[in-house]
């Protein structure tokens, strides 16, 4: 109520001053025309009408403590003058829509088993994350339909996975893990759980390592195919390594898993790291001076 009264007082003051100005300008114009005394009287009366309003000033200007009126306080933000772009931190999308292979289904079996679907409630689907649209625009039935199939591919916290790994290891039958599921290390290690390596003191019999590519990433795009001479050297190297392990002293299985890595692969890996890691460049001297 007080603020409304103050606003009313300020508005009345402003209108009074406007009237004064208008009347004064009118009187000057009319004086120049030549009707001097006839116009001065109405001007005098107009000023007399507005005088009591000006003497009863607003409470803000009492005791000489003038407060600024809050008229210009709400101002739209000015455009940025500097032409340098606004740098936002990179947006990582942790849920992958493609990761619905059987290995991931095995990992998240316990989540799908939960009857009330509590795990899928608070998590909107990765498509919504990447598009940046809120799930409130969708109706309730639709969100239920979206979240239900995607619950299998939702990543878990490491603490949860530690608890469930022990139960999973007993449940996983070896037939369910095919060659396509050997891409992640966890499923490979689940295959060989409970069996110690039998290669100690004999030839290495771990056949699985021989036809496994060590550096195969699903995220690599535009990998140039190896030139034929490069491929032949790679084969020679792997054959010589195999012969060495068979003939010489017994080597460990991990030695067999080491594959000849050439420059192309390493370059691809470095690009891969740059793509997924945000490594800020060193500041220039002028920027450092600005920030200190």
Swiss-Prot record:
Coiled coil: none annotated. One of its GO terms (biological process) is cellular response to hydrogen peroxide. It holds the Pfam family DUF776. GO terms for cellular component: nucleus. The modification Phosphothreonine is found at residues 143, 233. Keywords: Phosphoprotein. InterPro entries: DUF776. Residues 24-178 are annotated as: Disordered. Residues 65-83 have a biased composition (Basic residues). This is Oxidative stress-responsive serine-rich protein 1. The lineage of its organism: Eukaryota, Metazoa, Chordata, Craniata, Vertebrata.
């Amino acid at each position: 109520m007080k603020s409304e009264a103050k606003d009313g007082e300020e508005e009345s003051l402003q209108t009074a001053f406007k009237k004064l100005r208008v009347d004064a300008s009118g009187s000057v114009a009319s004086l120049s025309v030549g009707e001097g005394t006839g116009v001065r009287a109405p001007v005098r009366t107009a000023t007399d009408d507005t005088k009591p309003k000006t003497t009863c000033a607003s409470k803000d200007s009492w005791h000489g403590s003038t407060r600024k009126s809050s008229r210009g306080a709400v101002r739209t933000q000015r455009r940025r003058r500097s032409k340098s772009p606004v740098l936002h931190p990179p947006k990582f999308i942790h849920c992958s829509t493609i990761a619905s292979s059987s290995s991931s289904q095995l990992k998240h079996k316990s989540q799908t088993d939960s009857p009330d679907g509590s795990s899928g409630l608070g998590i909107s689907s990765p498509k919504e994350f990447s598009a940046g649209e809120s799930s409130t625009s969708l109706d309730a039935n639709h969100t239920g339909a979206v979240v239900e199939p995607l619950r299998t591919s939702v990543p878990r916290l490491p603490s949860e996975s530690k608890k469930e790994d022990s139960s999973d290891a007993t449940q996983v039958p070896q037939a369910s893990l095919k060659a396509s599921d050997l891409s992640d290390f966890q499923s490979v290690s689940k295959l060989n759980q409970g069996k110690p390596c039998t290669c100690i003191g004999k030839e290495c019999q771990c056949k699985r390592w021989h036809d496994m590519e060590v550096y195969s990433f699903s995220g690599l795009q535009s990998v140039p195919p190896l030139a034929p001479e490069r491929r032949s050297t790679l084969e020679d190297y792997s054959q010589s390594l195999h012969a060495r392990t068979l003939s010489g002293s017994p080597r460990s299985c991990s030695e067999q898993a080491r594959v000849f890595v050439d420059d192309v692969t390493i370059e691809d890996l470095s690009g891969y790291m740059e793509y997924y890691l945000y490594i800020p460049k060193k500041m220039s001297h002028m920027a450092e001076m600005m920030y200190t």
